[in-house]
Structures are given as C-alpha cells and as structure tokens.
Design a protein with these regions (language model features):
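Short, well-formed alpha-helical segments that are part of the catalytic scaffolds
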Residues: 19-32
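A conserved acidic beta->alpha catalytic loop
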Residues: 45-54, 74, 98
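Glycine-rich, basic loop-to-helix element that forms the pyrophosphate-binding segment
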Residues: 72-89, 111
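Short aromatic/hydrophobic "clamp" motif used to bind/position activated sugar donors
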Residues: 94
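Conserved donor NDP-sugar-binding/catalytic core segment of glycosyltransferases
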Residues: 107-142
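Conserved nucleotide-sugar donor-binding catalytic segment
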Residues: 146-239
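Catalytic core of nucleotide-sugar-dependent glycosyltransferases
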Residues: 154-155, 197-198, 221-229, 234-264, ...
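Membrane-interface aromatic/basic loop that binds lipid-linked glycans or pyrophosphate carriers
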Residues: 275-340
Length: 340
C-alpha cells in the first residue's frame, strides 16, 4: 500500500471482550481526539457474551465514517483478534487502545503523528501513562521510564524489551507506529505474531519497531491503564499466571534465538522466569505444571536456578509439599494482620 492509497492516515485498533462497562469510555476517549488528519477505528469484539457487541454496533452506526466493526466470528483470542484488525487497517500509522483502558489527552494522536511525519527514521512514538484503579478511581505511576530521551536508538532498547517484567518499556496503548514496517515484519515471520504459544501481541511489535529504527518518547501522560479486575495478564489464579508467564517467555526465547541475542541479563531473566513458574506450580499444588518447568528449562536452554532446585526438593514429596504450603499460609496470614 503506497502513501497515496491510504484512506486514513491513522488507524486505531480497539480490542474488546465482555467490557460493556468500559468500552463506551474507551471509544469516547478516541472519538474526542483533535487531529488535523483523518483517522479510523478498527473495532474487534471477540464474541462478547454481555452487551459489548450491541454497544459496538451502536457506535458503528453512529460513526460510520470512522468506526469499522469487524465481523462477528467464533472466539479468536487476543492474538488473532489483534492481527486480524491490524491487517484490516487502512492507515499509514497504527495506534491502539484496549477496551478497558482510555486516553486522557485529546491531542495524543496529533502529537504522535506530527513526530512520525517529521522524523522518517522514527518507527514508533510512545508516551507516559498511569495505572487507573477501577474501584477507587485512583491513579498511580508505573515508575520511571528507563529510556526517557526524546529519541532513542531502538537497538539500545532491545534487551530491555525482551526482559521486561513490570513496567513495559513501551506501553503499546500509548504508542503509534508505522504500518508498512509492521506489515513487512509480519509477512517475513508470521510465526512471531500468530503463534498461540506466545500469549501476547504487543512485545513482538515493540521489539520489531525498536529493531528497525528509532523510538520517540513524549513525557506526557496520555493513557489510563485500567486494573482492579482479572485479565489475561492480571490474575490471582496461579495456574492462569503460570500459563501466561510461560507463553510470554516463550516469545522472548524465540526472539532471542531468531535475532541472536544472548547475554548475562537475558540468561538471568530466563532463570528468574523458571523460578517464578516453579512457585506458581508450588502454590497451586500441580504436579503437571511442576514437570512443565523442566520442559521450559530445556526449551529456553537455561539451567534451573538453585532456589528453584530447593523448591523442587520440597515438591518431590507430597508430605513436604503440603507442610510448606501450610507454613506459607501461616506467614501470609501474619503479613495480612500486620498490614492492618
């Protein structure tokens, strides 16, 4: 697609599933953007079972020149939903916002498209953001961005992107990136983007954009990132967390092997992930998950760390396993009392 063929300069991807309480807020925050260039919203509802679909259909009827609602299909999952939307985008640049998050700066798109138009070597621009507690409505900072220069050589960010565990180096819902670079990367290696065993859609996009050029940063808050309810990445269920951590780390491992990235930092990261998986398996007392940790060690080509080996000894016998679970329960109870 050449520049003259772009119907809209910007495409905004919105994924949603069972978010009837928040999707209106999300769409309104995008529709109120003040931008000198046209933009579209590509809306992907993943077969919601509540009223989300009806709300999306209503918005698509009210704003037919802006919102394109993807066809209703059986549950795709977040990966296929995202990249189906991406391939449907008609814009030169792509932004996105999840169906429970929302933008808080009406000039977000204007600021970002201006940077991309004026800096052809910049592949992605992103901003600062805040956590938003759905219950209390309070906002909290995610911490300092380690790459806070106006423009950074993306190659300097690769290792940090691969090994991120807490604050994402680039929060994709704050970002805008070049569609042509993304489409080429997708065509060159569709496995990186469509493999269901990788579990997320954003890390690989951020990596590719950093690998292919410079990253611009705007130190202004444009996004409130919702939390306070269970999601794929936020769950108190140890089994669900085990699966999520395993899949996202599979992606990091694939990227490291594909792009020949190997350092003490990446090795330590994979070891820490093995320990994290071990503890998830320990807490939910699941022998199958425990065995899967060794499979991950082999796949990621990393030795199980000493602290995980100690946990393995405890978990080798159900008597000791149950005993240490009981001891842990006591300590957790004491910590809870002390916090009051």
């Amino acid at each position: 697609m050449t520049p003259s063929q772009y119907k809209n300069l910007i495409s905004v991807i919105v994924l949603t599933y069972n978010e009837e309480k928040t999707i209106t807020r999300t769409l309104d925050s995008i529709l109120c953007q003040k931008c000198h260039v046209p933009f579209e919203i590509v809306l992907g509802d993943d077969c919601s079972t509540d009223n989300t679909r009806k709300i999306c259909e209503d918005y698509a009827r009210r704003f037919p020149n802006i919102i394109r609602l993807m066809e209703k299909t059986p549950n795709k999952g977040v990966i296929d939903n995202y990249f189906d939307c991406l391939l449907a985008c008609q814009g030169k640049y792509i932004a996105d916002c999840a169906g429970d998050d929302f933008w808080v700066d009406p000039l977000k798109l204007e600021k970002e498209v201006t940077i991309l138009e004026n800096n052809p070597d910049v592949t992605l621009v992103h901003t600062d953001w805040m956590y938003y507690d759905e219950e209390t409505k309070a906002t909290t900072s995610p911490g300092t961005n380690p790459f806070n220069s106006d423009i950074t050589d993306g190659r300097k960010m690769l290792e940090a992107i691969i090994t991120q565990t807490k604050r994402p180096i680039i929060h994709l819902c704050t970002a805008m990136y070049r569609a042509d670079i993304m489409r080429k990367a997708y065509n060159d290696d569709p496995k990186m983007f469509r493999n269901k065993d990788f579990g997320c859609e954003d890390l690989q996009i951020c990596f590719i954009m950093a690998y292919m050029g410079k990253i611009a940063y705007i130190p202004k808050i444009t996004l409130y990132y919702s939390y306070g309810r269970e999601t794929v990445s936020f769950s108190n269920n140890d089994k669900k967390q085990f699966i999520f951590v395993k899949k996202t780390t599979n992606l990091s491992s694939y990227i490291c092997k594909t792009y020949n990235i190997n350092s003490q930092t990446t090795y330590k990261y994979f070891q820490n992930r093995l320990f994290g998986l071990t503890m998830h398996a320990f807490r939910c007392k699941d022998k199958h998950l425990h065995r899967m940790v060794q499979d991950c060690s082999n796949d990621w080509q990393v030795q199980i760390p000493t602290k995980a080996k100690i946990a393995n000894v405890i978990m080798s016998n159900m008597l000791t396993w149950n005993l240490f679970l009981y001891i842990r329960k006591i300590f957790v109870g004491i910590k809870h009392i002390l916090r009051k």
